[in-house]
């Protein structure tokens, strides 16, 4: 902002705080507008397998991603059964880091995810994060415990069980394509396995003062697995 304020005068520069799509017709031509949004590196599955270290995942990157939540009713946020999101993948002309701080975007690709696809995506991320934390050469115990705590929560309206109730419960599955329901079930199987493995890793690392905390998480895990088994009609 300072760069362009110095160039055009601060009274002529306006920041757009919303990272959504901007209609040029809504803008006043006498102002220079700057829109800033947070992006994260974007990798395909194959790339993730090749880029194993933190260094490899933060260097020589030219594709970035940001997501915008929306609902068909026009609201930004809604319940899990109505929450959609638009994913935008940006490809820059050069890889970061670069000799310049700003690099033009060569092209952008948009994908809209419907509610069950959002659930599949969010649960797949949880599985990948747990697996990555457990496979690190030096396990970050604080990060692992935070991730576990959020994963084995059995709250009614939050966490993984909210997705299971919304999309895998008998009264709801018929509303969604069979292939998406099957995929979400498979992701949940992987999720339960990843949580169990993460609990085992955590148990090996903790000291005596955290034994009670570990037992509490294990109890939550068993309760979550039990409820998932009832929803999915199979032992997970």
What residue ranges belong to the model's regions?
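Eukaryotic intrinsically disordered, low-complexity segments enriched for acidic and Ser/Thr/Pro residues
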Residues: 2-236
């Amino acid at each position: 902002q300072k760069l362009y304020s110095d160039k055009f005068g601060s009274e002529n520069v306006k920041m757009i705080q919303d990272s959504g799509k901007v209609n040029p017709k809504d803008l006043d031509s006498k102002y220079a507008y700057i829109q800033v949004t947070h992006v994260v590196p974007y990798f395909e599955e194959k790339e993730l397998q090749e880029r194993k270290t933190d260094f490899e995942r933060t260097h020589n990157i030219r594709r970035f991603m940001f997501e915008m939540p929306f609902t068909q009713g026009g609201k930004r946020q809604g319940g899990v059964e109505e929450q959609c999101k638009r994913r935008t993948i940006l490809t820059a002309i050069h890889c970061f880091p670069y000799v310049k701080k700003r690099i033009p975007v060569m092209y952008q690709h948009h994908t809209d995810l419907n509610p069950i696809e959002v659930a599949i995506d969010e649960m797949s991320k949880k599985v990948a994060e747990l697996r990555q934390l457990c496979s690190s050469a030096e396990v970050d115990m604080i990060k692992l415990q935070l991730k576990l705590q959020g994963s084995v929560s059995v709250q009614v309206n939050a966490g993984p069980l909210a997705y299971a109730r919304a999309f895998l419960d008998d009264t709801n599955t018929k509303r969604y394509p069979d292939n998406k329901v099957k995929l979400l079930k498979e992701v949940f199987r992987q999720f339960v396995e990843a949580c169990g493995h993460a609990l085992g890793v955590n148990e090996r690392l903790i000291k005596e003062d955290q034994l009670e905390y570990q037992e509490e998480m294990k109890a939550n895990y068993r309760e979550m697995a039990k409820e998932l088994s009832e929803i999915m009609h199979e032992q997970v």
